[in-house]
Curated annotation (Swiss-Prot):
Lipidation (S-diacylglycerol cysteine): C27
GO biological process, one term: peptidoglycan metabolic process
Annotated HAMAP family: RlpA
Organism name: Aquifex aeolicus (strain VF5)
Subcellular location: Cell membrane
GO CC terms in record: plasma membrane
PROSITE patterns the record matches: PROKAR_LIPOPROTEIN
Stretches that traverse the bilayer: none
Name listed for the protein in its UniProt record: Probable endolytic peptidoglycan transglycosylase RlpA
Pfam families referenced in this protein's UniProt entry, alphabetically: DPBB_1
GO molecular function: lytic endotransglycosylase activity
Role played: Lytic transglycosylase with a strong preference for naked glycan strands that lack stem peptides.
PANTHER family: ENDOLYTIC PEPTIDOGLYCAN TRANSGLYCOSYLASE RLPA
Length: 226
């Protein structure tokens, strides 16, 4: 888990001003998705040499590729290979395969990794903006698993999109009232014709669209994928 280190400083007049600013800003920002970065190609190298080891898990994990990318891993020691989907886990170093594959592939090795598919659907680059109509979903889906594998929480600033890579951050603007919210793409949808984005209850409330149900929107891509 990430650790945050605190420190103490004498509180002078400047310190009080800074402290009040931090308190006020923390009250106005509910989401933890604050980072704003450039739009970039998702991490999907066509070929790479990566350290491959094993974990007592059902799935394969990596910190090197977009979530749900599919790769071919070759052990140069014995020529054996495996095709497998990878799940993103930033605590993992290299690629961690299910332990059941050790008998076939052999001891941990520096593997040759070939990209078969970037992410869930092959999207390597996000557009700078998306526009259309957004709807929202909440209680009925609260606690259910999303397409990305995490549990849907209607009180988080989440979104569903048909093809943007999971982990993508969007700054969504309600074109009816100008209100904005930053959301994270964790699910697929919407599948209703004429709709382009599904937002969680919390995000919809922030945008003031609960009563409207569907609103015209514009979204700026702050981060493409994880």
């Amino acid at each position: 888990m990430e650790r945050f280190l605190g420190f103490r400083t004498p509180l002078g007049a400047l310190g009080v001003v800074i402290l009040l600013t931090l308190i006020l800003s923390s009250c106005s920002v509910k989401t933890s998705y604050k980072e704003k970065g450039r739009v970039y190609n998702g991490k999907c190298p066509e070929y790479a040499k990566v350290w491959v080891h094993y974990c007592p898990t059902k799935y394969a994990y990596t910190d090197r590729y977009q979530h749900l990318s599919k790769v071919k891993i070759v052990n140069p020691r014995n020529g054996k290979s495996v095709k497998i989907s990878l799940r993103l886990n930033k605590k993992v170093r290299g690629i961690c395969l299910p332990k059941r594959l050790k008998k076939y592939l052999g001891k941990p090795f520096l593997g040759k990794v070939y990209l078969l598919r970037c992410g869930e659907n092959g999207v390597k680059k996000c557009p700078k903006y998306i526009r259309g109509y957004a709807s929202w979903y909440g209680g009925k889906f609260h606690g259910r698993k999303t397409a990305s594998g995490i549990r849907f929480n209607q009180h988080e600033y989440y979104a569903a999109h048909r093809y943007l890579p999971f982990g993508t951050l969007l700054e969504v603007k309600n074109l009816k009232n100008g209100r904005k919210v930053i959301v994270k793409v964790v699910d697929r949808g919407p599948y209703v014709r004429g709709r382009h984005l599904d937002l969680s209850y919390a995000a919809a409330k922030k945008l003031g669209m609960i009563r409207d149900g569907v609103i015209p929107f514009e979204a700026k891509v702050l981060r493409c994928g994880y």
